[in-house]
Amino acid sequence: MRWPCSSWFRGLWPEAAPWAVLLALGVPGWVLAVSATVAAVVPEQHVSSAGQAPLDWLLTDRGPFHRAQEYADFMERYRQGFTTRYRIYREFARWKVNNLALERRDFFSLPLPLAPEFVRNIRLLGRRPNLQQVTENLIKKYGTHFLLSATLGGEESLTIFVDKRKLSRKSETTGGIPVVGGTGNSSAVSLETLHQLAASYFIDRESTLRRLHHIQIATGAIKVTETRTGPLGCSNYDNLDSVSSVLVQSPENKVQLLGLQVLLPEHLRERFVAAALSYITCSSEGELVCRENDCWCKCSPTFPECNCPDADIQAMEDSLLQIQDSWATHNRQFEESEEFQTLLKRLPSDRFLNSTAISQYWTMDSNLQHRYQQLGASLKVLLKKMHRIVRRLFNLCKRCHRQPRFRLPKERSLSFWWNRIQSLLYCGESTFPGTFLEQSHSCTCPYDQSSCQGPIPCALGEGPACAHCASDNSTRCGSCNPGYVLAQGLCRPEVAESLENFLGLETDLQDLELKYLLQKRDSRIEVHSIFISNDMRLGSWFDPSWRKRMLLTLKSNKYKPGLVHVMLALSLQICLTKNSTLEPVMAIYVNPFGGSHSESWFMPVNEGNFPDWERTNVDAAAQCQNWTITLGNRWKTFFETVHVYLRSRIKSLDDSSNETIYYEPLEMTDPSKNLGYMKINTLQVFGYSLPFDPDAIRDLILQLDYPYTQGSQDSALLQLIELRDRVNQLSPPGKVRLDLFSCLLRHRLKLANNEVGRIQSSLRAFNSKLPNPVEYETGKLCS
């Protein structure tokens, strides 16, 4: 049903309103649809009993809903002690309002009934107004939109706040219906009475309010509030802004607005839209500019920071700070949780726990794992929210001179929590625990705490760690692992005692000193040995056509049982007859400690980095030369016997080459065709002898099976390993070291093969337990 209202609105509304809210233009006519409804009593229970927890958490500021007037009323009533709200209301007089002025223009081509003042302001703009003029003359006075259609209406309601704890229960004891008298001072009131009075509100308003006010004064258990909003009928409203709560917005009744530019002449429409967008978006502080899918405000000189919404940026930065506080709260709650504290109580205190040990206890605690997963889930939610705010913050600040200031929290790793447990265990002797440093076994205390470190138990483990802590003081070691010795409560690497009692190895000569002594052929470095040969004699000429074998031996077991010998150089003085074309060729074999010839090693003369023979003339007439090979400190080695195999070759010089070619001499039956003779005057070994005590080494070996005291077996093994390594260091050059130590045991200590093998196995087993063991492969030399 449509009918016009009896009054007309005057022109445009003069006051501006925000964006997307009604910015008024008066309408010359109304289309009204009247309806009224009455609602039932609606109770809202907020606190069920006196023992329930208070609702203070609900009364905090949480958004627009909590700032609504009705909620403010509820909050006030609740804080005064009321627990229940009864509300009866009815909506009345809803009118559907349509703008007939546009319909008359669109359908009947009638001119718009614009207000004279509005028309005058349009004319004052001229043909080409700037945006500031449009804003001052139109937008600030009339807004940016006008009303197409809306729904008007009102509401009246009665609200009763009730405190059930204060209601009288006399009616329950008497069993009668409570009667509320106008003069009684002790009337019994029940909830049923309040229901009946609320239901009669719209029937007899004045009588109902009078009785309710009497109950309110008499009992103090209720509080009555009456609310009436909206127009009471189709009255003469000149301006809708003067009516409170007029517009009714609901899904079926929406306010429809239209831009004010449709009422303006064609030449003003584009300028008006630009001015309206700048006014709304830039708050009259600049001009809106859009390029390449991006819009911003071109700020005026008066407002250089118009693109920078300080309030919004500050609010987002505050939100980030709140999230950081929540982040820290979650971590603190996890540390204070029952699961975390239970793990701390279960950890052993009689030994030190490193990060690896704590991680094992951490992994085995299923309850703690579940609690840690909850912490991770909560932090992920906060991190997602923080990233969303940060993106919005950067979008807002991309045209600001000041960049946003914030710090993203980082999720604490498992290693952090393991170190935190160590800090609580060992650095908690003050109000605030310090930070434990596992590498230095110390605590870093807070700046205001002089000391926070408590007793730190000894560390159990391999290597330098303790095997057991002391029973009387857990901070000190009680026993150590093999290869370490206990010293002042700590495990230090065990070092072998001096080997001077077994084998003296500290008489090395410097290279320059050795070279000088060899040049002088100093007798102090000559090792006197026995020359043996069945093929020749020293100082006698012989025919070198066939191989000659000679050797120098010491026979130490017979003559020098307390010495072992080191060879530094080998020298021969060889003489040749005049015009001889023979060239001596020698093969040298060295036997280190005795035994058969098969237990000797071949000297690789001039191979690789090994030295070659050096020849110096002694007697030019007899063509004598000293042939010397110098091993020096680099290639020195043990020797007991030196085998020399001498052969000769014919030396000739090829005219087409600078190389020397050797030929094996032919067998000459005619002495007249002999190519020459050879003589060896001396064969000497230069070096030095070392003191050697085989009995002391035998006693050391006996301690492997029969230790004198506790720890003597380990000490004996360490000394034997040191002796083995130092003897094998003088092994001859080669890809694999020769096992000279086994030769020493076999030939100088006269041990059986099985005994030597058992000793070597014991040394290898003990060496594998030592810290940083050095293993090397050795080749067998002695059988």
From Swiss-Prot:
Entry protein name: BMP/retinoic acid-inducible neural-specific protein 2
Keyword Cell cycle attributed: yes
UniProt KW Transferase keyword: no
Subcellular locations according to the entry: Secreted
UniProt superkingdom: Eukaryota
Entry's Gene Ontology cellular component terms: dendrite; extracellular region; neuronal cell body
Transmembrane segments: none
Listed InterPro entries: BRINP (IPR033237), MACPF (IPR020864)
